[in-house]
UniProtKB/Swiss-Prot annotation:
Family annotation (SUPFAM superfamilies): HydB/Nqo4-like
Record Gene3D superfamilies: Cytochrome-c3 Hydrogenase, chain B
Molecular function per GO: NAD binding; NADH:ubiquinone reductase (non-electrogenic) activity; quinone binding
UniProt keyword Mitochondrion, yes or no: no
Segments of this protein annotated with the region Disordered: 1-51
Descriptive protein name: NADH-quinone oxidoreductase subunit D 1
Family: Belongs to the complex I 49 kDa subunit family.
Record flagged with keyword NAD: yes
Catalyzed reactions: a quinone + NADH + 5 H(+)(in) = a quinol + NAD(+) + 4 H(+)(out)
Assembly and binders: NDH-1 is composed of 14 different subunits. Subunits NuoB, C, D, E, F, and G constitute the peripheral sector of the complex.
Record-linked HAMAP family: NDH1_NuoD
Pfam families linked: Complex1_49kDa
Alphabetical UniProt keywords: Cell inner membrane, Cell membrane, Membrane, NAD, Quinone, Translocase, Transport, Ubiquinone
Amino acid sequence: MATEFTVPDSAARIATAQQAGGGTPVRSGPPDEGGEFSGDRMSLSMGPSHPSTHGVLRIQMELEGEILTKADPIIGYLHRGDEKIAENMTYNQFVPYTDRLDYLAPLANNMAYVIAVEKLAGLTVPPRCQAIRVITAELARISSHLMGLGAFGLDVGAWTVLVLSLNQREFLYNLFEDLTGARFTTSYTRIGGVTRDVPPGWLENVGTFCDKFLPALEEILSLLTRNKIFLDRTVGVGVISKEDAIAYGITGPNARGSGIATDLRKDRPYSGYEQYEFDVPVGTKGDCYDRYLVRGEEMRQSVRIIRQVIKNFPGGDWYATEAKKVFLPPKGKVLSSMEELIQQFMLVTEGPQMPAGEVYFEAENPKGILGFYIVSKGGGVPYRLKIRSPSFCNLSLVPKLCQGVLISDVVAILGSLDFVMGECDR
């Protein structure tokens, strides 16, 4: 739960700034007939190349002095047409494109997409595969929150937080590389399973990371949690009410920071999450500070989940053996069996054949709820694929959040929302 602190809130600072106004504006609207500027408003474009927009986002702002009267996010600079691309690719071929949605948590994106396809195909993966997916998803959550926390700290002037966060994330990338062969865009999850089983000693390395990470996390959080400057910049700033969070479709840590105790891993468990004990952190004020606290606690809970998975890690297969029509056969069998060779050829060229129908699945990703709606007319490619992006919903609230705040607070608000433009623009 969030802790209350008695510090000046944004409303008090705005009132002080307004009372101190009256000076000559830096720029004041369009020039009049005499060539002079008139009025008291200034137009300012923030981005699309700006360190505090966390990607290619542009905010078109209007200001009166240092107070924002308008802030319109302009998106689309990273639009690639992912949903249309999906209509011209087999279900397996689209997996790498999901890496590039929330590119800070590709393993979590993979899992959400393949579970949607498995739901369409009526497949159930074995417990070992589910356990692997849970571990990778929670490691991805920690990795994403570390980057969000570090960037947020940098935005408000805490450079050391970024350095320490990136240091811990490097250990995670080593684990990802050992498991998947890639550090960033992994493409590890497959329809009906995963690319390969966990290598020898990998689970022990994950456990060692968890043991070392928790003290490191406490050190990182101690730099911010009771830091007077950080409190001044975040407490009472960018408040999202419960009503606004629901109306705008805000999910994930941003919704939980506003007191909405919802988490799909608890409410609608998938991939075996119902087996694990963990808490859902919830804030009380809905401001930037509460969102920071929620993400910090979520990393602790992710470690708690990972330790339970390792302790009860199941044996058996890491892919659905009955899913021959969707899962590529092992390479050894392809080289020795004509039947397996033909199966691989058909899966690569035609794609896994799906029944006609439609399905929607959503997962609890680090940024919020990531959903995939798939319409199939049968065959190896989807007729329509729609992506429900949490970052898109989070950004839709920016005009309301930034109304009447100081321009310096915009940086804190954007950092606390922790969006990623690859997912928003897709």
